[in-house]
Amino acid sequence: MIMIVFIHSFQSIAGAAAAESNVHKILFALFMPTGACLYLFTMGFGSVFTRHSEPKDMVRNGVRLLVYQGLCNLCYAAAIIICFHIRILLTGEVAGSRELYEANLYSVLTFVNIFFISGMCYLVLAIYRKLEVKLSGYIISAVIVGILSPFTKLLISDNQALNWILDMTFGGKGETSFCFFPYLSYVFLGYVFGKVIRRVPENEKGEFYKKSGTVCGVIAVIWFVGCIISHPSVEKFFDYMLVQYRTPGLLKVAGSFCAIIFVFAVAFGIMPQVEKWKFGYNKLCYFSKQISKMYAIHIGVFWAIAGFSAFYPYNVKECLLWAVAVLVATDLLVQGYMKVTDKIKTEKK
């Protein structure tokens, strides 16, 4: 989540120089092997263990997340509109800011993020569960999606409305931030891994994670180093990773899968030590439970900053400082929201 906030600072409030800086590109490249892939993998993994794993439950979750996406877009637009016009009232309109305002407003109303992807993936999982697809079917589907993704992104239409649908499904033009079809691979593999780990006896899970984490960690390093060698400059490496992050091919899926299993293994290994550190463990549990709220809110905070700043092009140092401020502000907003909702629930009782 911390890395996401830093990257989004460059993607929302940075000037052209900062957005093209090596700092942004390196941050993005380091985040790329996991990031949204890890989130979707964990979603598939968690669907194995949740009590709400029936197809109807998944449909309900999927629809709810799609509604969240729409509400988030409206809230982001409201943040831009309100903050931009407050700025105009205070200082007058900044030259050239109106065009940036209109472009960014259109962007936040039409782009899709992790909520849309998760919602669509839940609906697909519901279909698979309803059809009682075997475990091998999930693996085959993950491979097929990884093979097809580089080709399906070529589906582009001259019709703006149709192209928007194609873009957020397959990722052709890259104007909607994310697209859901290529990410199905991670959801399918997460589901498969959840089924596998469920069959491993509790007293053997440590050894299982140790072996699988070691093998997958080595493969992930080889893959990542191979990507660097085959794209030997920061710019080429960033461009390649950007394309692969949005519309991952089979090799990227395999590399990220190995990186994610390594992360799972490390987390399993260090968790007993983390549990002894009560403050850190409680914070980790808090962020795990509230990550969706933090993800949704921090983007709105960035757009509020952008609007109030009249879309001033911040430099690298300023983006990094704003990222820290947004992290703190987001945490405070989520805590405030939780206190208010808890108070309302208590009063109802």
Description of each model-found segment:
Residues 1-349:
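Alpha-helical transmembrane segments and their immediate juxtamembrane cytosolic regions
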